[in-house]
Amino acid sequence: MIKRKESKKSILKIIIMFLIIFILFLLYAYFIGTKGLIVKEYKINASIPDSFDGLKIVHLSDIHYNRTIKEKELKKIVKQVNLINPDIIVITGDILDNDIDATDSKEILIKYLKEMNAKIGKYAVNGNHDLRYDYWNDLMESVNFKILNNTYDLVYYEENEPIVIAGMSSYFDDIDINEKLKDYYNFISENDVKYKILLLHEPDTIDNINNNFDLILAGHSHNGQVRLPLIGAVVLPNGSKRYYKEHYTINNSELYISSGLGTSTLPLRFLDHPSINFYRINTK
């Protein structure tokens, strides 16, 4: 009897210990993991026109505004972006998470997105969460972001030799992937452009496109959002099952995936702080 009682006490102690660890994990993942904004800087040597040598691109993604990212966090993000003094700012989807139309939250979001400064231009593509809201296009245009859903833009700086930035809408929009980049491929077939950038939301999409880009920037995966030692990402959304880590080299393309700024599904982050990606591109 004594041994049984001691055994039950031991099991109870183990259960209590695991509960305490789990509660501490949740507290950390919510109160600390979702904070602590970091900047990830990447230096890229590429065959880019000389006039773009030293090009600075800031890459934001997955804000999921009004969940863990609210006005206080937006203010910090904008301050950090403007400290970098970027030439180009890109957003690869999921600015929105819930409906903020006709609310003060929408006006706050507009205010801070307008305050982001870029010397050359600001570009965006939508994400699967943005697709829910018809006002996404108007919102982005009102804050001076050029929308690149299934189109492209020739970007000039100082000289006449441009680079091209193309974009794809979220693959959840039911548009055939080959159709999305049709205009871009028609242009590239007739024009020699030295450096080509693609913006998209779901990184797994690249397996279905013609590999014709030097730099591909994506989001969606949050790099796992909750990552455990020895295990890695706990849950990955459809569209980022294959590609979800920070960086991949695929044939001649460099793919960078943002860990995002906000959270999706659960308001938790572990071993994966919200981040701004900063690319400094130099000529080879």
State where each predicted segment sits.
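Conserved beta-sheet core of the metallophosphoesterase superfamily
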Residues: 203-280
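Catalytic metal-binding/acid-base residues of hydrolase active sites
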Residues: 64, 96, 128-130, 152-153, ...
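Beta-strand-turn-beta hairpins that frame and shape the catalytic cleft
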Residues: 45-58, 145, 152-167, 192-195, ...
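Binuclear metal-dependent hydrolase catalytic cores centered on His/Asp/Glu-rich metal-binding motifs
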Residues: 134, 138, 142-145, 151-152, ...
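Membrane-embedded segments
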Residues: 51-154
